[in-house]
Amino acid sequence: REGQKKAAATCKLLGLDGIVSIGGDGSFRGLVELAKQGISVVGVPATIDNDIVCTDYTIGYDTAANTAVEAIDRLRDTMQSHERCSVVEVMGRNAGHLALYVGLATGATAVLVPEKEFNFQRDVVERIRLARLSGKTHFMIIVAEGVGSAVEIGKQIHEALGLDPRVT
């Protein structure tokens, strides 16, 4: 708060009309504090998490989503030829927008997001089992970082199904 007070005083000293900030939730929290001190503020949402309320897409989200999809498309070639399971962790501390989009775009076997508590047996093991029954030999699990450790999820898959997942 001391930093915001100093920033507000500096804005007033310099005679600024206001502050424009490009950023995510941390930047927006700072703007709220400046606004409470009478500074006019404008926030431009820019975060790959796409978690700023009242916005459809934030700057950076589309690039992050497309980069992840391209990387997974390349990874899929190896997965298919070696009949592998991959667990891919994407950004998304408190928001699973990126993981969900990437999972849908790549046809993932399962997508785990922080907004929805998951049951490992039902949401991962059973989906892999059903995919196997339908003839699939490779499986993609997308995990938002806020869900927990992708490495641990990979270990659980190994223990439950005997697969040797690659975690990325």
Question: For the regions a protein language model found, what residue spans apply to each?
Answer:
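Short glycine- and Lys/Arg-enriched binding-loop motifs that mark or flank ligand-binding interfaces
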Residues: I19-I22, I39, P45, D56, ...
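Short, ordered loop/turn segments at secondary-structure junctions
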Residues: G24-S27, I39, V44-D51, E115-F118, ...
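Glycine/threonine-rich beta-strand-loop-alpha-helix active-site module
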Residues: Q37-R74
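N-terminal glycine-rich phosphate/adenylate-binding segment common to multiple enzyme folds
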Residues: R1-G38
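Accessory alpha-helical/coil subdomains and C-terminal extensions
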Residues: T10, S21-G23, E33, Y61-V167
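Short, well-ordered, mixed-charge alpha-helical segments that flank or form enzyme active sites
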Residues: S27-L31, D49-V53, N94-L98
